[in-house]
Amino acid sequence: MENAFKLLYKTIEERKGSPLPESYTNYLFSKGEDKILKKIGEECAEVIIACKNNDKEEVVKEMVDVFYHCFVLLAEKNIALEDVMREVKERNGKLSRVGDRREIDTL
C-alpha cells in the first residue's frame, strides 16, 4: 500500500514540476492553497455522506479522493510524503489515552 501512495505522490510532484495543460492536478496547483483546501473539505463531506449511507464502495472511492487532494496539499506546501510516513510509523503501536486528547468543543 505504501508503494501506491509513493507512486501517487511522485506523479503529483511531477505534475507540479512539469505542468500538463489538461491536468486536473495542475489546475489545483494553479488555483492555489485555498482551492486545494476547499476540495479537501468537499471530499471529506462526501466520505461522511457515504458512511451515513452505508455505501462501502462509495466510501472507498471518496477516501481515495481525500488522499489524492491531501497529497496535492502536501506537494503545494513542499512537505515530503516520507515525513508523513515517518510520523505514521512513529505513532504506530502507541497507546493513546482518551484523557490525553482535548475535547472537540474546546478546539
UniProtKB/Swiss-Prot annotation:
Its main location: cytoplasm. One of its GO terms (molecular function) is phosphoribosyl-ATP diphosphatase activity. SUPFAM superfamilies: all-alpha NTP pyrophosphatases. GO terms for biological process: L-histidine biosynthetic process. Gene3D superfamilies: MazG-like. It is found in: Cytoplasm. Keywords: Amino-acid biosynthesis, ATP-binding, Cytoplasm, Histidine biosynthesis, Hydrolase, Nucleotide-binding. It catalyses: 1-(5-phospho-beta-D-ribosyl)-ATP + H2O = 1-(5-phospho-beta-D-ribosyl)-5'-AMP + diphosphate + H(+). Its EC number is 3.6.1.31. The keyword Nucleotide-binding applies. Belongs to the PRA-PH family. This is Phosphoribosyl-ATP pyrophosphatase.
